[in-house]
Amino acid sequence: MSQKKVALECTKCGARNYTITANPQRQERLELRKFCKHCGEYTIHRESR
């Protein structure tokens, strides 16, 4: 299986702050709690495709 680069987007402001490699066959989108430098706080970042 090949890995694909995907961006993690802040759910509060919409900024794409992080990129990760993920398996494209997954059905659900990845959600992580990360620091957003635009909001200045920890928010949920969702995988954008």
From Swiss-Prot:
Cellular component annotations (GO), alphabetically ordered: cytoplasm; ribonucleoprotein complex; ribosome
One Pfam family hit: Ribosomal_L33
InterPro entries: Ribosomal_bL33 (IPR001705), Ribosomal_bL33_sf (IPR038584), Ribosomal_zn-bd (IPR011332)
GO molecular function: structural constituent of ribosome
Example GO BP: translation
Assigned keywords, A-Z: Ribonucleoprotein, Ribosomal protein
Family: Belongs to the bacterial ribosomal protein bL33 family.
Protein name, entry field: Large ribosomal subunit protein bL33A
Originating organism: Limosilactobacillus reuteri subsp. reuteri (strain JCM 1112) (Lactobacillus reuteri)
